């Protein structure tokens, strides 16, 4: 090596090592394994540092395009691969969607989510969905859509329409994922989330528990979410609804205390996220839902139907919040 090469070698900037994950799976498992009271106490402390602990955001979810999906997700009634008796429908008209949003607002919702059963939207679908987004925002509602995988230009188009959140769940841990779906890779999901983030849209990303996964695999899902940089602003936690005709129709029901633990672990690992009680809430009695709020859930999907499965009735939800001394709040009013 020449003198010049030696000088060059000694002044070369060393390559930085990859940043260590904020949450190792082992760390998340350790949270799960805390005594129940200790876990909820820590989660509630974390929750109060960032949010009004008695405020809940009410969200309504509308299926704007039902059934006929190309994906083979083992939990989903809308997959064309499963015989669930669900008839495929076309994309709803804009006026019909806006009428549903208006009703949701009248019933107390402050967030309106629109879901379409697609592997990915075609470009021709984007324009009417942009109209829906603008119309819902004009009502003063927060907007979220879930349409499947997105291309970069599609994410940018939704951002230009003013979309607040894009939902694209990871569903489960990387290790368990292959047992649930074969038509879309884990990396496909991560790529869509990156495009959403790059477009300047808030990320809504969570998963489903109770699909037969182990606690370690539940911890793997939470670690994946918590280690995103930044972690999602919105984290829906779904409790599997076992639907006749799907591969998971006979899945063993999850211990409800494990569901509450998952809410608490999500709150601790993602302290500033909206943690949302999503599908499967009708499987939890009032006491378990109250424990979920204590564990840090600060949003719930509200209304009689959640995509194609049942949901506790709106009136029952209002009564539960009143019994608990809690109240529905705008997202902007939730922070402490």
UniProtKB/Swiss-Prot annotation:
Sequence ranges assigned to domain Radical SAM core in this UniProt record: 54-281
Cross-referenced CDD domains: Radical_SAM (cd01335)
Cofactor needs: [4Fe-4S] cluster; [2Fe-2S] cluster
Keywords for this protein: 2Fe-2S, 4Fe-4S, Biotin biosynthesis, Iron, Iron-sulfur, Metal-binding, S-adenosyl-L-methionine, Transferase
One Gene Ontology term from the biological process aspect of the record: biotin biosynthetic process
UniProt catalytic activity: (4R,5S)-dethiobiotin + (sulfur carrier)-SH + 2 reduced [2Fe-2S]-[ferredoxin] + 2 S-adenosyl-L-methionine = (sulfur carrier)-H + biotin + 2 5'-deoxyadenosine + 2 L-methionine + 2 oxidized [2Fe-2S]-[ferredoxin]
Function: Catalyzes the conversion of dethiobiotin (DTB) to biotin by the insertion of a sulfur atom into dethiobiotin via a radical-based mechanism.
Record's protein name: Biotin synthase
